[in-house]
C-alpha cells in the first residue's frame, strides 16, 4: 500500500514534503523449544501516523488514527511493524502488552529464528516529539559490551516540521560508541544523521528521498543484522526489499538508502 510520503507516483512533491511524515524487554514466554539469542537485539520506536496531530497529507482515516495502533499504517496495517513481523517467514511474535504508558500504546516482542529479538514500541502519533527524543536518547546510550544492539525509528520525519524543532535542543551528545542506528523516514539522512553522530552512534541505514517506511524494510535490515552483515550489505538488503514491495527496479530501490552525511 502506498500513501502520503510513500509514493511520488501519487502525490506532488510539495505535498510529499509536508507528509514526510527500556527499558526492560517485555515478552510472553515462548515454548521451550523456541530459545532466542539474548545478545542480539533491535529496539524499534514506531511513531504512529496521525492525520490530526502531524503536519501531513491525510491518509485514509482508518489507518491514520494516531491513537489507535490496531489498524495504524505503521503498526496494525498489512505492512505495519506488528502485523508484518507476526507473519513474515522465520519470525514469531513472543508477546505484546498494551498501554505501557500514555505515550507508548503497545509494545511487542518478536524473534527471528534463534538469532535475534526485536522489541517494538508503538508511540501515540501526537507524541512524535517524544518518540524522536527517546530514539535519540537510546542511540546515545552505549551498547552493552556483551551484546549486539541496534535502535531504529520508523515513521514520519518529524524533524521536517517546524513545530518539532524545539526538541532538537534536547537531543543528547555523547562520545562515539558505535551503536548502530536506523531511521526509516523520509529524507532521514539530511535530518537525522548529524544528530546521531553527535550522540555517538553509528547511522547505518538512512534515506535520501521520500519513501514508505514500511516493515518489510525493517525486516530485511533485521535479518542482515542478525547475520552480522556489513553496513553496505544492510543498505543493499533494505533497497532490495523496498524494490520488491514498491515494484521498482533494484537500482532505484537501493538508491533510496545510504548515509551521505557520516564521517
Where are these regions (language model features)?
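Bacterial N-terminal signal peptides
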Residues: 15-28
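Boundary at the C-terminal end of the N-terminal hydrophobic targeting segment
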Residues: 32-34
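Sec-exported extracytoplasmic/periplasmic mature domains
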Residues: 82-90, 156, 226, 230
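Surface-exposed patches in mature extracellular/periplasmic domains of secreted proteins
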Residues: 91-98, 206-208, 233-237
Amino acid at each position: 500500500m502506498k500513501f502520503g510520503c510513500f509514493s511520488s507516483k501519487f502525490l506532488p512533491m510539495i505535498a510529499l514534503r509536508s507528509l514526510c511524515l527500556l527499558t526492560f524487554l517485555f515478552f510472553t514466554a515462548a515454548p521451550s523449544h523456541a530459545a532466542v539469542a539474548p545478545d542480539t537485539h533491535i529496539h524499534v520506536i514506531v511513531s504512529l501516523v496521525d492525520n490530526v496531530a502531524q503536519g501531513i497529507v491525510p491518509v485514509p482515516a482508518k489507518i491514520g488514527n494516531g491513537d489507535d495502533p490496531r489498524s495504524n499504517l505503521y503498526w496494525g496495517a498489512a505492512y505495519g511493524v506488528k502485523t508484518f513481523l507476526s507473519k513474515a517467514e522465520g519470525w514469531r511474535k513472543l508477546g505484546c502488552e498494551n498501554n505501557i504508558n500514555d505515550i507508548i500504546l503497545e509494545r511487542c516482542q518478536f524473534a527471528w529464528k534463534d538469532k535475534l529479538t526485536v522489541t517494538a514500541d508503538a508511540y501515540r502519533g501526537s507524541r512524535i516529539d517524544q518518540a524522536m527524543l527517546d530514539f535519540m536518547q537510546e542511540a546515545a546510550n552505549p551498547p552493552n559490551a556483551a551484546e549486539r544492539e541496534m535502535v531504529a525509528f520508523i515513521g514520519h520525519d518529524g524533524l521536517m516540521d517546524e513545530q518539532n524543532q524545539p526538541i532538537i535542543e534536547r537531543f543528547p551528545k555523547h562520545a562515539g560508541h558505535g551503536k548502530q542506528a536506523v531511521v526509516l523516514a523520509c529524507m532521514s539522512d539530511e535530518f537525522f544523521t548529524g544528530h546521531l553522530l553527535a550522540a555517538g552512534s553509528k547511522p547505518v541505514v538512512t534515506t535520501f528521498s521520500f519513501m514508505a517506511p514500511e516493515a518489510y524494510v525493517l525486516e530485511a535490515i533485521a535479518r542482515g543484522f542478525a547475520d552480522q552483515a556489513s553496513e553496505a550489505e544492510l543498505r543493499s538488503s533494505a533497497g532490495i526489499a523496498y524494490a520488491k514491495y514498491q515494484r521498482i527496479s533494484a537500482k532505484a530501490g537501493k538508491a533510496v538508502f545510504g548515509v551521505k552525511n557520516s564521517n
